[in-house]
Curated annotation (Swiss-Prot):
<dbReference type="GO" id="GO:0005737">
    <property type="term" value="C:cytoplasm"/>
</dbReference>
<feature type="region of interest" description="Disordered">
    <location>
        <begin position="203"/>
        <end position="227"/>
    </location>
</feature>
<dbReference type="InterPro" id="IPR007439">
    <property type="entry name" value="Chemotax_Pase_CheZ"/>
</dbReference>
<dbReference type="Pfam" id="PF04344">
    <property type="entry name" value="CheZ"/>
</dbReference>
<comment type="subunit">
    <text>Homodimer.</text>
</comment>
<keyword id="KW-0963">Cytoplasm</keyword>
<dbReference type="GO" id="GO:0097588">
    <property type="term" value="P:archaeal or bacterial-type flagellum-dependent cell motility"/>
</dbReference>
<dbReference type="InterPro" id="IPR050992">
    <property type="entry name" value="CheZ_family_phosphatases"/>
</dbReference>
<feature type="site" description="Enhances dephosphorylation of CheY-P">
    <location>
        <position position="160"/>
    </location>
</feature>
<protein>
    <recommendedName>
        <fullName>Protein phosphatase CheZ</fullName>
        <ecNumber>3.1.3.-</ecNumber>
    </recommendedName>
</protein>
<keyword id="KW-0145">Chemotaxis</keyword>
<comment type="similarity">
    <text>Belongs to the CheZ family.</text>
</comment>
<dbReference type="GO" id="GO:0009288">
    <property type="term" value="C:bacterial-type flagellum"/>
</dbReference>
<keyword id="KW-0283">Flagellar rotation</keyword>
<comment type="function">
    <text>Plays an important role in bacterial chemotaxis signal transduction pathway by accelerating the dephosphorylation of phosphorylated CheY (CheY-P).</text>
</comment>
<dbReference type="GO" id="GO:0004721">
    <property type="term" value="F:phosphoprotein phosphatase activity"/>
</dbReference>
<feature type="region of interest" description="Disordered">
    <location>
        <begin position="1"/>
        <end position="23"/>
    </location>
</feature>
Length: 243
């Protein structure tokens, strides 16, 4: 008959207590490995100067957020000014319209059946009072129309801000693409350069002007083969890298 096996004082138990210790050890190794990889990546980026690209891209994000908040505030204020002007001008216009329609109906009735002199006098007095008040009403309406027009000044200000945000988005894209291009394998870089050159030649032949290629982000100095010249090339680069 087999004797039961008992764990000695120095032996590790066969139960479930050994699994958490092994799992903790594996987790520690994974964390240590991730830390080493992070440090290696950080040191490599610093040596290559790529940390500055990422730093500039990261610094642009809060600025872009603040500018977008400014655009939202300006458009909200302009919308409120327009709505307030409409709320002021609309009753004035409605009052003028109602009084004009009432006077027209009274004059039409008098022409259909002439009335006594006293009633004609009253109708004429009401008409003159309406005509005297009409310039004030139109001036008030014109003032609100001017306010609506002035409220559109946000378009120029926000347009400048939006252009700045677009420039910052371009900067972020440029810096991140620089990091990607400078760290891909040489054969990948040559393959992308050939694709970029083919796209550039195709676009030049289609537009007849190589200047149209300057609209996209450029991630390398002029004259190098790994220059990204339009958004199609950016998409092609990211696709070739598996993104």
């Amino acid at each position: 008959m087999n004797e039961p096996i008992h764990a000695g004082p120095g032996d590790a138990p066969f139960g479930g207590d050994s699994q958490p210790e092994g799992a903790d050890l594996a987790s520690d190794r994974i964390l240590a490995r991730i830390g080493q990889l992070t440090r290696t990546l950080r040191d490599s980026m610093r040596e290559l100067g790529l940390d500055k690209h990422v730093e500039r891209a990261a610094e642009a994000v809060p600025d872009a957020r603040d500018r977008l908040r400014y655009v939202a505030t300006m458009t909200e204020q302009a919308a409120e000014r327009v709505l307030n002007a409409i709320e002021i001008a609309k009753p004035v216009q409605e009052r003028v319209q109602n009084e004009a329609e009432a006077l027209d109906a009274r004059w039409a009735q008098w022409y259909a059946a002439p009335i006594e002199h006293a009633e004609v006098r009253e109708l004429m007095d009401d008409t003159r009072a309406f005509l005297r008040a009409l310039p004030d009403a139109t001036s008030a309406t014109n003032a609100q129309l001017l306010e609506i027009m002035l409220a559109q000044d946000f378009q120029d200000l926000t347009g400048q801000v939006i252009k700045k945000i677009m420039d910052m988005v371009y900067l972020i894209e440029q810096q991140l693409l620089t990091v990607l291009v400078e760290n891909i394998a040489p054969e990948r870089r040559e393959q992308f350069a050939a694709t970029a050159a083919a796209l550039a030649a195709e676009k030049t032949s289609a537009t007849g002007s190589p200047e149209s290629l300057l609209n996209g982000p450029q991630i390398a100095p002029e004259g190098k083969p790994d220059v990204v010249q339009d958004q199609a090339q950016v998409d092609d680069l990211l696709a070739s890298l598996g993104f």
